[in-house]
From Swiss-Prot:
PTM field: One or more lysine residues are methylated.
Gene that encodes the chain: rplK
UniProt name for this protein: Large ribosomal subunit protein uL11
GO BP of this protein: translation
A GO molecular-function descriptor: structural constituent of ribosome
Cross-referenced InterPro entries: Ribosomal_uL11 (IPR000911), Ribosomal_uL11_bac-typ (IPR006519), Ribosomal_uL11_C (IPR020783), Ribosomal_uL11_C_sf (IPR036769), Ribosomal_uL11_CS (IPR020785), Ribosomal_uL11_N (IPR020784), Ribosomal_uL11_N_sf (IPR036796)
Keyword Metal-binding: no
Pfam families from the UniProt entry: Ribosomal_L11, Ribosomal_L11_N
Quaternary state and interactors: Part of the ribosomal stalk of the 50S ribosomal subunit. Interacts with L10 and the large rRNA to form the base of the stalk. L10 forms an elongated spine to which L12 dimers bind in a sequential fashion forming a multimeric L10(L12)X complex.
Keyword list, A-Z: Methylation, Ribonucleoprotein, Ribosomal protein, RNA-binding, rRNA-binding
Function: Forms part of the ribosomal stalk which helps the ribosome interact with GTP-bound translation factors.
Similarity-based family: Belongs to the universal ribosomal protein uL11 family.
SUPFAM superfamilies referenced in this protein's UniProt entry, alphabetically: Ribosomal L11/L12e N-terminal domain, Ribosomal protein L11, C-terminal domain
Length: 142
């Protein structure tokens, strides 16, 4: 008999930095998930990734208190800020530009995010990334 899934939990956890402290511990504890077991498994799975990168994780937990999780790629905004060396986006996107990004960099970000984006081809993925860049106050050039 298959395990019965009780629910799912979506979190964004820095790569290699899952700890039982808030906000992770309480979110998992409320659902009866073994916090230390998740932290060890998550940190092991993300040790090859860039330290501190925010990794979206979807945790599926079951009736017998076990769980499985799947990792996604970091958000587009993380890649954009990293490419242009920004701390944060524009306070007034569309009016105040905080930097420029080339189409080549947009393409490389779209290729990295392709498996998580709801796009059929790289051109559609690039348009999604361009939209995110514009909403952060970045100018797309090239």
């Amino acid at each position: 008999m298959a395990k019965k899934s009780i629910g799912q939990l979506k979190l964004q956890v820095p790569a290699g930095a899952a700890t039982p402290s808030p906000p992770i511990g309480p979110a998992l504890g409320q659902r009866g998930i073994n916090i230390m077991e998740f932290c060890k498994a998550f940190n092991a799975a993300t040790q090859e990734m860039e330290k501190g990168a925010p990794i979206p994780v979807i945790i599926t937990y079951y009736q017998d208190k076990s769980f499985t999780f799947s990792l996604k790629t970091p958000p587009v905004s993380f890649f954009l800020k990293k490419e242009v060396n920004l701390k944060s986006g524009s306070k007034e996107p569309g009016k105040v530009s905080v930097g420029r990004i080339s189409r080549d960099k947009i393409r490389s970000i779209a290729e990295a995010k392709m498996k998580d984006l709801n796009a059929n081809d790289i051109e559609a993925a690039m348009r999604m990334v361009e939209g995110s860049a514009r909403s952060m106050g970045l100018e797309v050039v090239g």
